[in-house]
Amino acid sequence: MPGIETIKSSWADEVELDYGGLPPTTETVENGHKYVTEYKYNKDDKKTKVVRTYKISKQVVPKTVAKRRTWTKFGESKNDKPGPNSQTTMVSEEIIMQFLNSKEDEKANDPLLDPTKNIAKCRICNGEHWSVNCPYKGTAMDTNMMEKKATAAAAAAVDAPKSGKYVPPFLKDSVGKVGMGMRGRDDTAAIRISNLSESMTEADLEELVKKIGPQSKMYLARDKNTGLCKGFAYVHFKQRKDAAAAIEILNGHGYDHLILSVEWSKPQNN
C-alpha cells in the first residue's frame, strides 16, 4: 500500500484557508515588552506577517498630558485600547520646538553677527575686504585716495569750531616756533606710527608721509644689535593740521601686510 505523501504548505496558505482573509491583529505583553502581530499584503499581493516589539516604560508626564490620555476615543478607534493604533493612527513627522529667551532673540537679530554680511570695508576702493588685501594697494587709485583724505582732513582741521577753552601760546600756530625754542622741540605736531615691519627704512617712512604734508623731523627706532626696525617711528610735521590728517589717513591703513596704528605723540616730561 503506497504511503501517504505529506503536503507541506506555508503559514500564509494555512492562514488563508483558516480565515479566508487577513487575520486580526494580536497583542501580547511579556516581561515588560509588548508584541504586536499583524498581517497585510505586500507589493506582490502576498500575505505577510509583521511583528512589532515595544518596550514598556513608565515616565512622569504633565497633568494635562495624563488627562488627555483619559479621553474617550471615537470613530474607527472607538473600541481601541489605550495608546495609538497603527491601523488608524500614523505619525507624519516629528516637530521639535525650541524656545528662545530675550537675550538669544536679540543676539539672533544682531546684524553684526550675521555670517552672510561682510563687515570688512576697504579704505582704498570701499570694497568688501580689508585694506591690506586690496588689489589696488600701491596703485594710482591708492595715491589719489590718500590725497583726497589729506585734503579733507586739513579742511576739517581749519574749519573746526573753537571750543572757547584757553589755549597756551606755544600750542598756537602763530607762536609755535617760540614754544619750540623754549622747550627745545615741538611735540604738538608729532605723531607716533607703530606696528611697522622690521624691514622698514627711513626712505620708506618718508615715502609714506611725504604726500600728506611737510615734515620737520622723522625718527625710525632701530635695534642697536641687528639694525632692524623696532616697529615704531615718530614724525614731526610743520603744521598740526597735517599731523591730524596723517592720523586720519594712516591709522588702520594696510602697509607691508600689517595694519598701522597712528596716534598723537605724548610729550616728554623734562
UniProtKB/Swiss-Prot annotation:
Domain RRM, first and last residues per copy: 189-267
Subunit record text: Component of the eukaryotic translation initiation factor 3 (eIF-3) complex. The eIF-3 complex interacts with pix.
PROSITE patterns in the cross-refs: RRM
Single biological process term from Gene Ontology: formation of cytoplasmic translation initiation complex
InterPro entries: eIF3_g (IPR017334), eIF3g_N (IPR024675), eIF3G_RRM (IPR034240), Nucleotide-bd_a/b_plait_sf (IPR012677), RBD_domain_sf (IPR035979), RRM_dom (IPR000504)
Protein purpose: RNA-binding component of the eukaryotic translation initiation factor 3 (eIF-3) complex, which is involved in protein synthesis of a specialized repertoire of mRNAs and, together with other initiation factors, stimulates binding of mRNA and methionyl-tRNAi to the 40S ribosome. The eIF-3 complex specifically targets and initiates translation of a subset of mRNAs involved in cell proliferation. This subunit can bind 18S rRNA.
Subcellular location: Cytoplasm
A single GO cellular-component term on record: eukaryotic 48S preinitiation complex
Gene3D superfamilies associated with the record: 3.30.70.330
Family designation: Belongs to the eIF-3 subunit G family.
Superkingdom per UniProt: Eukaryota
Keyword terms: Cytoplasm, Initiation factor, Protein biosynthesis, RNA-binding
A single MF term (Gene Ontology): RNA binding
Protein name: Eukaryotic translation initiation factor 3 subunit G-1
